[in-house]
Amino acid sequence: MKISFQKVLLNKRFPLKISRFVSSSCYNVFIKVEKDGIIGWGESAPAEKGAKTADEIITELEKLIKTNISNKSISEIEQISRELKISPCSYAGLDIALWDWKAKKANMPLHALLGLPIPKTKTSLTIGIMSPESVKERIPLLFHNSTAKYLKVKLGSPDGIDTDKLMYEQVLESSKKYNLGLRVDANGGWNTEEAKYMIEWL
């Protein structure tokens, strides 16, 4: 089994602002597993806990590969990963690639290989912290011709919960026509009292 990595710069369609920073791009790692003429693909994304960069992901996975995992089962590889304390965000991409390879080898969709029904998970899109005026523009751009049924709303503005409330009120108004389920993520932008208040308000 040959395992290789490719670090790829992914540019976001729109910069994403959360309570702690603004992100317009990121490096992810695409993982390729080759064996018997079949290729499995996976993707790992850095996380705040564990491997914080694409390079750290590659370093961790190279450490795992050096344990000679070629003839191990997926469950055995996962156990070795846990013993080596490989970050979940790093291992996830390799796990995906291994299962992708296994399903292709069996010439079956992965859900069928696992004995599961066709997945019916509804896609969610995310909107970052922004002004109500920007919300008016952004939501139609995101959901025009989209099959997504949920919108995750980033709150926790450095300008305070009154700013969050104005933004969220505009989200409610602008999302009506799309019949969306809404989720809120403040990313640690509220203290305990603010969180209690906003939970009630929302």
Where is each model-derived feature located?
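Short, Gly/Pro- and small/polar-rich lid/capping loops
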Residues: 1-27
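Residues at beta-strand starts and edge strands
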Residues: 27-29, 38, 119-121
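Metal-dependent enolase-superfamily TIM-barrel catalytic cores that perform enediolate-based chemistry
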Residues: 112-202
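Metal- or metallocofactor-binding catalytic centers and their adjacent structured scaffolds
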Residues: 5, 33-34, 38-106
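Short hydrophobic-acidic sequence motifs that mark active-site Asp/Glu residues
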Residues: 30, 36, 41, 150, ...
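Generic structural signal for residues positioned in beta-strands
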Residues: 2-4, 30, 122-124
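Conserved active-site and cofactor/substrate-binding residues in soluble primary-metabolism enzymes
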Residues: 25-26, 52, 72, 85, ...
